[in-house]
C-alpha cells in the first residue's frame, strides 16, 4: 500500500484542521478552567513558599531565643556555683574562727581553773601548815598561845615558808 502525495497532503490538511478546531474548542470551552487551575496552583505554590520562608524566619528567631535562654541559664548556673563556693569558703572560715575562739576560751578557762586549783592548794597547804605550826609551837612552848600571838607566829612562819 503506497500512499500518494495527494493523499499525504490531504491527510496533513485534515489532521492540521482537526488540531486547529480542537485547539479552538479547547480555548472556547476548557481554556478558562485550565488557566484558573494553573493560576490557583501558582498562587498555592507562592503561598507555600511564603509560609516556608516565614517558618524558616520563625525557627531562626526561636533558635536565637533558645540560645539566649541557654546562655543566660549557663551564666546563672555559673553564678550560683560561684556564690555557693564563696558561701562555703565563708562558712569554712567562720567555723575555723569559731573553733579558734573556742580553743582560746577553753585554754583561758583551763588556765583559770589551774590558777584556782593552785590557789586552793596553796590555801589548803597554808591552813594545814598553820595548824601544824600551832601544834608545834604549843609543844615547844608547852603552853597555848593567845590568838594574837598565834596569828603573828603563823604569819611569820608562812612568810618564811613563802620566801623559801
UniProtKB/Swiss-Prot annotation:
Keywords tagged on the record: ATP synthesis, Cell membrane, CF(0), Hydrogen ion transport, Ion transport, Membrane, Transmembrane, Transmembrane helix, Transport
Localization in the cell: Cell membrane
Entries under Pfam families matching the protein: ATP-synt_B
Record GO terms (molecular function): proton-transporting ATP synthase activity, rotational mechanism; proton-transporting ATPase activity, rotational mechanism
NCBIfam families: ATP_synt_b (TIGR01144)
Subunit composition and interactions: F-type ATPases have 2 components, F(1) - the catalytic core - and F(0) - the membrane proton channel. F(1) has five subunits: alpha(3), beta(3), gamma(1), delta(1), epsilon(1). F(0) has three main subunits: a(1), b(2) and c(10-14). The alpha and beta chains form an alternating ring which encloses part of the gamma chain. F(1) is attached to F(0) by a central stalk formed by the gamma and epsilon chains, while a peripheral stalk is formed by the delta and b chains.
Function, as annotated: F(1)F(0) ATP synthase produces ATP from ADP in the presence of a proton or sodium gradient. F-type ATPases consist of two structural domains, F(1) containing the extramembraneous catalytic core and F(0) containing the membrane proton channel, linked together by a central stalk and a peripheral stalk. During catalysis, ATP synthesis in the catalytic domain of F(1) is coupled via a rotary mechanism of the central stalk subunits to proton translocation. Component of the F(0) channel, it forms part of the peripheral stalk, linking F(1) to F(0).
Protein name: ATP synthase subunit b
Lineage: Bacteria, Bacillati, Bacillota, Bacilli, Lactobacillales
Amino acid at each position: 500500500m503506497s500512499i500518494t502525495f495527494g493523499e499525504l497532503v490531504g491527510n496533513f490538511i485534515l489532521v492540521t484542521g482537526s488540531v486547529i478546531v480542537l485547539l479552538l474548542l479547547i480555548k472556547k470551552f476548557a481554556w478558562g478552567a485550565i488557566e484558573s487551575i494553573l493560576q490557583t496552583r501558582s498562587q498555592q505554590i507562592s503561598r507555600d513558599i511564603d509560609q516556608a520562608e516565614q517558618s524558616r524566619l520563625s525557627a531562626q528567631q526561636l533558635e536565637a531565643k533558645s540560645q539566649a535562654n541557654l546562655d543566660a541559664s549557663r551564666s546563672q548556673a555559673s553564678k550560683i556555683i560561684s556564690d555557693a563556693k564563696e558561701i562555703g569558703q565563708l562558712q569554712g572560715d567562720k567555723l575555723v574562727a569559731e573553733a579558734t575562739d573556742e580553743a582560746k576560751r577553753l585554754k583561758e578557762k583551763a588556765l583559770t581553773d589551774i590558777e584556782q586549783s593552785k590557789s586552793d592548794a596553796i590555801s589548803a597547804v597554808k591552813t594545814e601548815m598553820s595548824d601544824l605550826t600551832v601544834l608545834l609551837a604549843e609543844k615547844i612552848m608547852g603552853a597555848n598561845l593567845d590568838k594574837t600571838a598565834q596569828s603573828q607566829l603563823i604569819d611569820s612562819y608562812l612568810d618564811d615558808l613563802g620566801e623559801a
